[in-house]
From Swiss-Prot:
Keywords: DNA-binding, Nucleus, Transcription, Transcription regulation. This is Agamous-like MADS-box protein AGL8 homolog. PROSITE patterns: K_BOX, MADS_BOX_1, MADS_BOX_2. It comes from Sinapis alba (White mustard). The keyword Ribosomal protein does not apply.
Length: 241
């Protein structure tokens, strides 16, 4: 007795539904890959689970290329059928195209982040690895360039500061030199004035006090008249009481 025809309907049990989805999805992806390889056909397969998770397959990982070809074909077909497509329908088509591209880009982004890799074939994984290596190489090159530019800028700032410090040191030394020179001149002027200025002293004699002028030569002295050097009251002879 042969098997009866199984009626297709929604599986009510959540676990059984998930298991069936996983098995059928793998089989569908496998069939898509087989027809692509055996028949040299360009195949694009997009599957969304009940939770909104995306699963896809495309020949040689060219989903965007196949979708663009599909859009061109669809647009050309509509042009042949009739050119009375309204503007709103054009916007709907453009929206669908952009939405498909966004979904593909989001899928690629997740793949680059190391997510949703189970659905990728070996060839797709190798292509993804190559793209990541190229991206890392480009990032490392830009990082090294940025570090070099930063070091060069710091060296320029250091040179400017060094030149500024040298200029300040030069000014300080010049001011110190001028200060020392002025102090030496002041000392010399002070010494010269003390040598040239006459010194007076009083000496006593039998008749009273007389003045004596001391000049540069201390050995030579001249006596002055008492009344010409000192007032009269200071020249009166003292008396012993």
């Amino acid at each position: 007795m042969g098997r009866g025809r199984v009626q297709l309907k929604r599986i009510e049990n959540k676990i059984n539904r998930q298991v069936t989805f996983s098995k059928r999805r793998s089989g569908l992806l496998k069939k898509a890959h087989e027809i692509s390889v055996l028949c040299d056909a360009e195949v694009a397969l997009v599957i969304f689970s009940s939770k909104g998770k995306l699963f896809e397959y495309s020949t040689d990982s060219c989903m965007e290329k196949i979708l663009e070809r599909y859009d061109r074909y669809l647009y050309s077909d509509k042009q042949l059928v009739g050119r009375d497509i309204s503007q709103s329908e054009n916007w709907v088509l453009e929206h669908a195209k952009l939405k498909a591209r966004v979904e593909v880009l989001e899928k690629n982004k997740r793949n680059f982040m190391g997510e949703d890799l189970d659905s990728l074939s070996l060839k797709e994984l190798q292509s993804l690895e190559h793209q990541l290596h190229a991206a890392i190489k480009s990032i490392r090159s830009r990082k090294n360039q940025a570090m070099f530019e930063s070091i060069s800028a710091l060296q320029k700032k250091d040179k400017v500061l060094q030149d500024h410090n040298n200029a300040l040191l030069k000014k300080i030394k010049e001011r110190e030199k001028n200060t020392v020179h002025q102090e030496v001149q002041l000392i010399q002027c002070s010494n010269n004035s003390s040598i040239l200025q006459p010194q007076y002293c009083l000496t006593s004699s039998r008749d009273g006090f007389v003045g004596r002028v001391e000049g540069e030569n201390e050995g030579a002295s001249s006596l002055a008249e008492p009344n010409s050097l000192l007032p009269a009251w200071m020249l009166r002879p003292t008396t012993n009481e």
